[in-house]
Amino acid sequence: MKAFYGILIIFILISMIHLSQQVFINATCTVTSQCRPKCIEAIGQAASKCINRKCKCYP
């Protein structure tokens, strides 16, 4: 059982590190498809979301 909790803690820490790499850019949007070209221009990756009318890019 201790090994399970250890693996769970490691998984949570790795997830937090990965999620902290998200980048908000100062681009307004209404749908996610509007963010893709802006994220490609800003960080070189197309992974994006439109959240609260702001583009969020994922490297």
Curated annotation (Swiss-Prot):
A molecular function annotated in GO for this UniProt entry is: potassium channel regulator activity
Task: Indicate the secretion signal residues.
Answer: 1-22
S-S bonds: C29-C50, C35-C55, C39-C57
- Membrane spanning stretches: none
Q: Residues at site: Aromatic residue of the functional dyad?
A: Y58
> What does the tissue specificity note say?
Expressed by the venom gland.
Top-level lineage group? Eukaryota
Q: Indicate where this protein is primarily found.
A: secreted
What Gene3D superfamilies has UniProt attached to this entry? Knottin, scorpion toxin-like (3.30.30.10)
Q: Where is this site: Basic residue of the functional dyad?
A: K49
- Gene Ontology CC terms: extracellular region
- Keywords carried by this UniProt record: Disulfide bond, Ion channel impairing toxin, Neurotoxin, Potassium channel impairing toxin, Secreted, Signal, Toxin, Voltage-gated potassium channel impairing toxin
Subcellular location(s): the record lists:
Secreted
One Pfam family here: Toxin_2
Q: Which family does it belong to?
A: Belongs to the short scorpion toxin superfamily. Potassium channel inhibitor family. Alpha-KTx 04 subfamily.
Function recorded in the entry: Potently blocks Kv1.1/KCNA1 (85%), Kv1.2/KCNA2 (91%), Kv1.3/KCNA3 (89%), Kv1.6/KCNA6 (94%), and Shaker (97%).
Domain notes from UniProt = Has the structural arrangement of an alpha-helix connected to a beta-sheet by disulfide bonds (CSalpha/beta).
What is the name of this protein? Answer: Putative potassium channel toxin Ts25
Species annotation: Tityus serrulatus (Brazilian scorpion)
